[in-house]
Amino acid sequence: MDISASTDRLLLVVEIGNSSTSFVVFQGDQSLALQKVATNLLTTVDGVAASVEPIFAAHPMLVDAVVCSVVPQAEEAVVTYLHGSITGKVMQVNSALKLPFTLAYEDVTTFGADRLALCAWCCLSHTAYAFIALDIGTACTIDVLNSKLHYLGGMIMPGLELMARSLHEHTARLPLVDVSTVSLSLLGNSTTECMQLGIVWNFTLGLEKMIESIKMYLEYEEHDREILLVATGGAAPFVTSLFTMQCQVEELAVAHGARLLFSYNQ
């Protein structure tokens, strides 16, 4: 099956994250439209309708949809709306699908849909690589596959926003800071700067050190020399810009992975 083959049939991919949701219209492997909304607006079918109806108005030929979600309440509302609004297939990304990699996990039903889609995108978009896949958002996930496309394991940790929120909520006087506005230096000269820099450097340098260790594991234990580091998620461009190592950043990697899984399961 040539899953990369172009087609005239339009596909709606709904990527539901903890903070934001992306509605992406694909024709083949080309994204025609992207709309982002806050996930907390999608808790009801009416909320979904208000967000998605402009997309259907602009693309009346939409027939099929795939939903990739880490928020059950929003997923239920979106799927309910789509079943009543389109004539084609509505597919939900989960571990019951046919996957392009071997998933070794204690309980595959707990493996997040976003992680499934990201790993699928790695496997179906590239060949002859081992992969270290990062999704840097509200939480940060690391997933690792060898060049035989066997899932080796991963890590889940707080993202920048959660680290900032935790410092604020679990101390008496520390403010809630926005790390995206930090002026990068080594040391801060105010409480806000000290917090921003502490969060950013702790997260970035710690993450890069973990990646270095994973690369060594892949090289010496799995005998993989061609290793591709990829990243997606809202904070990926900022965080990876501070890396000393090369990293491929793809904003729509999870959406593309969901699209590829839809084709892979036809």
Curated annotation (Swiss-Prot):
Domain of life: Bacteria
GO molecular function, one term: ATP binding
Sequence positions that bind substrate: 105, 112-115, 191
One GO process term, biological-process aspect: coenzyme A biosynthetic process
CC per GO annotation: cytoplasm
Metabolic or biological pathway: Cofactor biosynthesis; coenzyme A biosynthesis; CoA from (R)-pantothenate: step 1/5
Manganese in keyword set: no
Residues engaged in binding K(+): 135
Top-level enzyme category: transferase
Annotated localization: Cytoplasm
Record-listed E.C. numbers: 2.7.1.33
Cofactors that this protein relies on: NH4(+); K(+)
Note describing how the cofactor binds: A monovalent cation. Ammonium or potassium.
Chief location of this protein within or outside the cell: cytoplasm
Active site location: 114 (proton acceptor)
Keyword ATP-binding included in the entry's annotation: yes
Catalysed reactions, as listed in the record: (R)-pantothenate + ATP = (R)-4'-phosphopantothenate + ADP + H(+)
Disulfide bonds: none
NCBIfam families the UniProt entry points to: baf (TIGR00671), PRK13320.1-1 (NF009849)
Subunit field text: Homodimer.
Family that this chain belongs to: Belongs to the type III pantothenate kinase family.
Function of the protein: Catalyzes the phosphorylation of pantothenate (Pan), the first step in CoA biosynthesis.
This protein's name: Type III pantothenate kinase
Underlying gene: coaX
